[in-house]
Amino acid sequence: MRVGVTLACTECKRRNYTTAKNKKNDPNRIELKKYCKWCHTHTVHKETR
């Protein structure tokens, strides 16, 4: 079962990305290193609820 999730920057707390994840394979919150246009650098983005 795939669900939509929002990714927020850990530096500025802005919600920059939306993506889908498989809850069966990834039951925990995901963390991805993505580009933040507000920080102008690559930062860790965490899943928000």
Curated annotation (Swiss-Prot):
Family of the protein in this entry: Belongs to the bacterial ribosomal protein bL33 family.
InterPro entries named among the record's database cross-references: Ribosomal_bL33, Ribosomal_bL33_CS, Ribosomal_bL33_sf, Ribosomal_zn-bd
Cleavable signal peptide: none
A cellular component term, taken from the record's GO annotations: cytoplasm
Protein's name in the database: Large ribosomal subunit protein bL33
Record keywords: Ribonucleoprotein, Ribosomal protein
A GO molecular-function descriptor: structural constituent of ribosome
GO biological process: translation
Ribosomal protein among keywords: yes
UniProt entry tagged with the keyword Oxidoreductase: no
Domain of life per record: Bacteria
